[in-house]
Amino acid sequence: MELKEFFKGFEPKSDKNTSHCYIDQYYNDEFSSKKENNIILLEIGVREGFSHILWAKYFTNGQIWGIDNGESGFDYSKLLKDTNIHCINNDAYNANFVNTLPKEYFDYIIDDGSHHPTHQKLFIDLYYPLLKTGGKLIIEDIQGMGYFTMLI
């Protein structure tokens, strides 16, 4: 089953399959052959947790990690009923915090946090060491090509 099938019924709660079209334009091709793998995915920006629930249902053998600053007021304990979801309430762009996370551990790290260019640059600098060999950093919502060139 294609990844976009998992997102049906979650619109507009998750924008990954609607306004941004990340499912069709990237995620389906990237993840479809890895559905049964023991993927360890970290996503910054839990908010209400809808994408984390979907990632956990899709990667049934995987571990889904999320970091959020808690500003949405969402009770993350609701997500923790699923044994392959882990949520951390902290500032994802704070170097002291990020240095407490395991190095060379994650297959994918997605930045769906503040969407601010300075945070996106920090994301690259701080989270690259946390990737396994062959792992990928993914930044959602880059604000334009001018900001993209600032990131590289």
Language-model features and meaning:
Residues 1-110, 114-152:
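A short alpha-helical cap/connector motif
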